[in-house]
Amino acid sequence: MAEVVAEVAEMPTQMSPGAVEMSTPMSAEMMEMSTEVTEMTPGEALASSLFFQHHQFMCSECGSLYNTLEEVLSHQEQHMLAVSEEEALTTQNVGLEPELVPGAEGPFQCGECSQLILSPGELLAHQDAHLRESANQIQYQCWDCQELFPSPELWVAHRKAQHLSATVAEPPVPPPLPPPTPLPPPSPPSEVKMEPYECPECSTLCATPEEFLEHQGTHFDSLEKEERNGLEEEEEDDEEDEEDDEEMEDEEAMAEVGDDAVGGDESTAGWAQGCGDCPQHQPSAGARRQHRRTAHSPASATHPFHCSQCQRSFSSANRLQAHGRAHVGGTHECTTCSKVFKKAASLEQHLRLHRGEARYLCVDCGRGFGTELTLVAHRRAHTANPLHRCRCGKTFSNMTKFLYHRRTHAGKSGAPPTGATAPPAPAEPTPPPPPPAPPAQLPCPQCSKSFASASRLSRHRRAVHGPPERRHRCGVCGKGFKKLIHVRNHLRTHTGERPFQCHSCGKTFASLANLSRHQLTHTGARPYQCLDCGKRFTQSSNLQQHRRLHLRPVAFARAPRLPITGLYNKSPYYCGTCGRWFRAMAGLRLHQRVHARARTLTLQPPRSPSPAPPPPPEPQQTIMCTELGETIAIIETSQPLALEDTLQLCQAALGASEAGGLLQLDTAFV
């Protein structure tokens, strides 16, 4: 989309590149206004000489010009509809079902900011915002001092004050108006003459928009190379500056020693180095070498803009201004590979390569991308039916690339040649060439989709109908993962690498997710709240586990309804041995130990028969005879005694103790 620009200049003798020659009849009112120009003041005559350069939009298919972007887009829809009708007609003649070629329906890409938009109406509304932004940036430039002004009134006041002060005493005599020329005959629309397109970088003229775009692509490649090699040149310049400073110090020291020894003139000793190309003199050989490299090098002709701090040269003032930000804001260095970047955002994007991060992942193939736009463009490759299909069999997801490709079948340029008229009708209509045979379609046995290749069919069955595969395996332990980024994170468990460090406590982690989860403990944020009791948690998994405490046991009428509780987080942990459900994994683990112990006892081999244990000893009865707290006698017997016999034994023992003898019991008595 062409950018809307308004420029202020004198009435040119030739048309600017890209303008259209148009002649309009001069009315009587305009003749009267032209005769009154001689009575204007110099400022009014200067203000009346302003003109606005009007840009038009050209159709990339037929070269037609339109004043607004809406007219161009509506006109290009006719080309798309004509192509779709022609393809449908050819397929009906062969006997095949017409293949739907999408026209205006589908995502469109903005040429200014590369944003994807779904409908033409939204695209027009989106590009109107760009037009309003560009319209607010119109400025008027003085052709003598190159100063910019936001309004024509300020521009006229500037011209009166600065550049017309010398001619105020003598008012300029306006040139006589040329006599009115007869109106030329109206030219047919097909004979519109187009001026060549001029490149703003190198002023190269191109005949067609396609050649102009191809030529500008070379400047983009050189710009990328310059930005890529800019840091290397800065490092080399810094090293050379250090060497030159050392040489300068050595030469100055030698000059001082020579002056002291010889006693020469100090005024001529410091200017001994002269430049061979210009009359300038330098104080040392290092300064002379630096002067010749910046002023007389071959690159100085094509890079006239020089940096005052590092003496680097650039081809445009915009690149010099962008380079100056590196001196103002400082450079950003990578701590891993010591690479230097001008912006902090570029350094952050570079650090993701070391960390192996991929913020946007494709769910079909597991590839990671740094931006959402690249992921959306990649996702189109997994679709079964592409948006745009050419007759030659090539498919395109971008409408602009599809239109550019179609021109290769018709010729170099899509615009008609200058002065060309409508081609004469052929005497005999030639039959259209037969369309190429459509590629073989492989239907999916599980759904109604069909694919042109076996690889796309297998990818579709694996992604849609098959179980989740773990195609990426660890080379150390053989564990499988769904995505490649998971393998990279898993390898850190083998290497012991923990590159993510907490700035608050210094603790390191193996993944960025674990670091983010840990940082919540320092901030005190608990974003997950229970709706029943109001308790807050730092992680959603802890909240889900806490929610099970509020759930009541559910009774089912039939046994087959019991496993459904696992789907609704009622009791998600199930024992496969006895069929019991548990709300926590810890309870399931404790329960499984019971089954493990039972299996251990069952699997133990039978022991050999052991000898019979000896009979237990006969029970003995102990009788203690006491008097006044003192033990008189202890009687042990293997048979229980009656109360009368026990009293007799105690009296006998008491009498024996008084007599000073021993009591002997007869076994027959006992």
From Swiss-Prot:
Q: Where is the composition biased (Pro residues)?
A: 171-189, 423-442, 606-619
Coarse class of the protein's main subcellular location: nucleus
Kinase among the record's keywords?
A: no
Q: Is Nucleus among the key words of this record?
A: yes
Task: Supply the Gene3D superfamilies for this chain.
Answer: Classic Zinc Finger
Tissues expressed in = Widely expressed.
* Zn finger (C2H2-type) location: 57-79, 108-130, 140-163, 197-219, 305-327, 332-354, 360-382, 388-409, 442-465, 472-494, 500-522, 528-550, 573-595
Q: Where is the composition biased (Acidic residues)?
A: 232-263
InterPro entries annotated for this entry?
A: Znf_C2H2_sf, Znf_C2H2_type
Outcome (variant: H409Q): In DENNED; uncertain significance
MF terms from GO for this chain are: DNA binding; zinc ion binding
Please tell me one Gene Ontology term that the record gives under cellular component.
nucleus
| Positions of the UniProt region annotated as Disordered | 168-196, 217-304, 409-443, 601-621
Q: Where is the composition biased (Basic and acidic residues)?
A: 217-231
Q: Which UniProt keywords apply?
A: DNA-binding, Epilepsy, Intellectual disability, Metal-binding, Nucleus, Repeat, Transcription, Transcription regulation, Zinc, Zinc-finger
Check the record and name the Pfam families matching this protein.
Answer: zf-C2H2, zf-C2H2_4, zf-C2H2_6
Q: Where in the cell is it found?
A: Nucleus
Function as written in the Swiss-Prot or TrEMBL entry: May be involved in transcriptional regulation.
Which illness does the annotation name?
Dentici-Novelli neurodevelopmental syndrome: An autosomal recessive disorder characterized by global developmental delay and impaired intellectual development apparent from infancy. Disease severity is variable. More severely affected individuals have profound intellectual disability, axial hypotonia, peripheral spasticity, prenatal and postnatal microcephaly, early-onset seizures, brain imaging abnormalities, and are unable to walk or speak. Patients with a less severe phenotype may achieve some developmental goals and show less severe intellectual disability.
List, alphabetically, the PANTHER family matched.
ZINC FINGER AND BTB DOMAIN-CONTAINING, ZINC FINGER PROTEIN 358-RELATED
Report the sequence similarity comment from the record.
Belongs to the krueppel C2H2-type zinc-finger protein family.
Protein name (database record):
Zinc finger protein 526
What is the species of this protein?
Homo sapiens (Human)
